[in-house]
Amino acid sequence: MDRGSLLPFQLWCPRPFSKYSQNQPRPPSTALKPPVCPDTSSGTEPDHRPAHLESTPPAVAAEAPTSQPAPLLSTAASGDEGRVLLDTWYVIKPGNTKEKVAFFVAHQCGGSSRASSMKVKGHWGSDSSKAKRRRRCLEPTKAPPDQGGREGTPATEVTPTSSGDDVDLVSVAEMVALVEQRAALALQSYPRPSTPAPVVFVSADQGGPAKGLGSERRSGGGDCSRVAEAVAHFEAQRDSPPTKGLRKEERPGPGPGEVRIAFRISNVREPHSPDGNLPNGGGGRPGCAYPGSPGPGTRAKDKITCDLYQLISPSRDALPSNVEFLLARADEASEGETPAPTRPEDTPPAPPPPPARDCGASGFHVDVVVTGVVDACIFFGKDGTKNVKEETVCLTVSPEEPPPPGQLFFLQSRGPEGPPEPPPADIPSTVPGPDDSEGTTDTSLCRLYRHVSHDFLEIRFKIQRLLEPRQYMLLLPEHVLVKIFSFLPTRALAALKCTCHHFKGIIEAFGVRATDSRWSRDPLYRDDPCKQCRKRYEKGDVSLCRWHPKPYHHDLPYGRSYWMCCRRADRETPGCRLGLHDNNWVLPCNGVGGGRAGREEGR
């Protein structure tokens, strides 16, 4: 009896039925490979399966050449290729665990040359439906590019085995673990052109490798560090809108609606290595390269849009009278390169800026700028950034006039009680030459972190001091506070008394009375209780009156009792009406006769 006639689908199970010889690989037609598994024609089981099954090996597989180029995923554990079939396609029921394993293996091994020979046959049930996910990932028009950039390269290094030898069976977990191990090793050796993984690059010595803080460096990179060494990260390159001068797969930028923190926003030209090549195949900044950035021929100019700069000065030509943008340049390199000016608008190179001046006490070096739209967020160290043009905001404000409210945190504190600010001239003076030793890289990274953190915390503290409410009332003397409180109504005094213990003590000690208070001050009636809530006046009482307008009702001696106005079921419940205390039990001075005369006049 044929095995395929019993079940509408076939499951791949490596144990305990037999070995891998029951499932044959399907090599692509463009790049033929030798059979990975023993040939079933020479085994113990005859080949009586139908021809439409995917486990049937093609007839041309035996004549494939055995010499193959270097593998992509077989960088480690080369002796296990006979055991683990990474290039095998099986007929698996959709939704099964083995289908996910097959997808994982297909994504790791499948290149542009494999998609043409893959076929999906619907033999999984009466509905004859295809695996949509498999059909989508193996579509010839959307085939993923080869990781190494080479076409026709086999995914595994095949070691043909004899048909009579027994092959050790491997479980699904072992196969997945080995595939993940090989994929990790392959990704380290062969970085993809467009990597969506978050990577941050920190500039180091030009021409020298950057030493990380304990993490490994990429084998194909130049002066770059991993995520654990940096402070921020680059987002996925496909989520941001196209940048002028960068293709879609090359631009690094933030996601939509994201706020970045850009440290020392600057722009420099390409570095000239001694051999004429750029490290890591990228251009634009010394010791900094993007994954998939253009080659040495094309220089990627990053557009940096700073909301803070645009808020203060939309253009450099029309500046306010009290704001100046000074360009603090670092020392020029030996080649005599001139740094390209960084502007809020991405425009062609402008005429050379005015020479930098020393800001003195009124200058503040902006190292940390909170931005809303930043197309590139780059961290520059103090080692390889000689051709860096930095901007220093200098505010000229006379000491007799008050500082503008929106620019207070740019001003340097004149008093001794303010926190000290770093002078703007300390950055170029601490830049070492490119011929220094590699031991300064770690110290420069630590110095960069400390410098950036200090500036960020200092600016945040100044912004918080700007935005927080000024508590001037706590500094006023008590007699001034009593005079102020005497002009406040009952609700305002009650709020102040419940808010601050200092205000509560002053109100109760001095007996502050509200402007709308109805307590009778007459010595004959001041001890009378409130006619609504029956509360007596106490010194400093600015509370609100709560009462029930209708009397308390009790149905039965043991039954339910309630207030007749609001149907509340307890006698001690607070009143449903809220107002002011009133202990005036006597009618106004005109008395009843005055009211009667008024009614008679009205007739």
Curated annotation (Swiss-Prot):
Residues 18-54, 113-165, 235-301, 332-359, 412-442 are annotated as: Disordered. GO terms for molecular function: ubiquitin-like ligase-substrate adaptor activity. It holds the Pfam family F-box-like. Residues 347-356, 417-426 have a biased composition (Pro residues). GO terms for cellular component: SCF ubiquitin ligase complex. Residues 470-522 form the F-box domain. Pathway: Protein modification; protein ubiquitination. One of its GO terms (biological process) is SCF-dependent proteasomal ubiquitin-dependent protein catabolic process. Phosphorylated by ATM in response to DNA damage, promoting ubiquitination and degradation by the SCF(FBXO31) complex. ATM-phosphorylated FBXO46 is ubiquitinated and degradaded by the SCF(FBXO31) complex in response to DNA damage. Keywords: Phosphoprotein, Ubl conjugation, Ubl conjugation pathway. It comes from the Eukaryota. InterPro entries: F-box-like_dom_sf, F-box_dom, FBXO34/46. The modification Phosphoserine is found at residues 21, 67. Part of a SCF (SKP1-cullin-F-box) protein ligase complex SCF(FBXO46) composed of CUL1, SKP1, RBX1 and FBXO46. Substrate-recognition component of the SCF(FBXO46) protein ligase complex, which mediates the ubiquitination and degradation of target proteins. In absence of stress, the SCF(FBXO46) complex catalyzes ubiquitination and degradation of MTOR-phosphorylated FBXO31. This is F-box only protein 46.
